[in-house]
Amino acid sequence: MENRRQDYILRVRYHNPLPPPPFPPKLINIPNPVKQYALPNFVSTLVQEKKIPIENDIELGMPLDLAGITGFFEGDTSWMHSDLSSVNLDPIDRSLLKVAGGSGSTHLEVPFLRRTEYISSEVARAASNRGNLRLTASTSKALAEQRGRSLREVPKQLEAINESFDVVQQPLEQLKHPTKPDLKPVSAWNLLPNTSMAGIQHLMLRVADDLSERSHSYSSLVNLQEGHNLTKRHEVALFMPSSAEGEEFLSYYLPSEETAEEIQAKVNDASADVHEPFVYNHFRNFDASMHVNSTGLEDLCLTFHTDKDHPEANQVLYTPIYARSTLKRRHVRAPVSLDAVDGIELSLRDLNDEESLQLKRARYDTFGLGNIKDLEEEEEKLRSVEGSLNEELSEEEKPAESREQLESAEQTNGVKPETQAQNMSASESQANSPAPPVEEGNTQPSPVEQLQNEED
């Protein structure tokens, strides 16, 4: 039996409260004779010591005779692909065709203090997890690629949109997970985009370093044990981009505890009596690495809105995350420049007219597609159109008012308004009616003409 040496390693976990040194390490100038290798006398001596025979022909040792390749000038490329159908592999070589990582050893290096039943259960759990992860990853990736290829055409996109309406009407018990059929749905939510946050780029910020101020006080130890490492100071912290010697990084600024409480009071109540400006002090520098999401929907921020009285109105608003950024503590590499900002004074003010207009327009134009001046001109045009419509409506209401005055006057004279209106309309029609036309063949003689005819 093979004997394996196992060492017992005890890992001591403790906090190191020592801060980093406030000064960079001392740079020592070590003489290095690098320049002598570029001198011409050194190269000449090197050539004399080591003679390398190089005999090259016209083709530099690589003769190319394309005429010897059959079918090359006719475009036949079958000579580039070798025929492997007639090759018989040796049984020993067939083992090389197995997929790497398909089967491996389940032996785990464990310390001698672990019990055997724990080791066996861990081996079985690790094997099952590897298989499930591999199957899930391959299946989900294949489904995503297949769906992406199928949705490249517009008719397929319309079909997918219509299918989404059918799925919403489908009973909850009939829903199935595409890759995990054992899961059963419990409740359904309406997934909708968060239009109020559509015009803003959101970043997922992850700090790899501990931001808590470590100390040996009793309160800090209690907060560390309870998990309250961050105080109110970090809730109102500021990031400022900085640069030094061609390198860019982020500077982190924090206020005091009292200032943080005053800032929150000022934000919650604009009329709060606080001392401005608020002073921020430099706390730490961070190196940032950013990964921009290619598709735009790799990371989503979900906001749940629950309605207990109407469960069908439950909504989940999603906001796409533009990029993920990781902040790591920046170590001191060079002397601190005199241009570094040690503190920031912050003052809060009310919104001006343009900013308030932008805030109001953001409710209807979340993407910021319209210009402020153009929007103001449109609003003025709408107001002028509304004014003209109001004038037309007022002119239409004037005859109605005169009609009411006429009716009231007729009632005082004892005449019914309906009969008087009919008489007025009849007289007006007679006065305004044209005379009947006179035909030429049916003209009647006047009385003078009749007397003359009788005397004759």
From Swiss-Prot:
GO cellular component: Cdc73/Paf1 complex; cytosol; nucleus
Species whose genome carries this gene: Schizosaccharomyces pombe (strain 972 / ATCC 24843) (Fission yeast)
Superkingdom of source: Eukaryota
Protein name: RNA polymerase II-associated protein 1 homolog
Modified residues (Phosphoserine): 388
Gene Ontology BP term (one): heterochromatin boundary formation
Keyword Phosphoprotein: yes
Listed Pfam families: Paf1
Main localization of the protein described in the UniProt heading: cytoplasm
Biased composition (Basic and acidic residues): 396-406
GO MF annotations, alphabetized: chromatin binding; RNA polymerase II complex binding
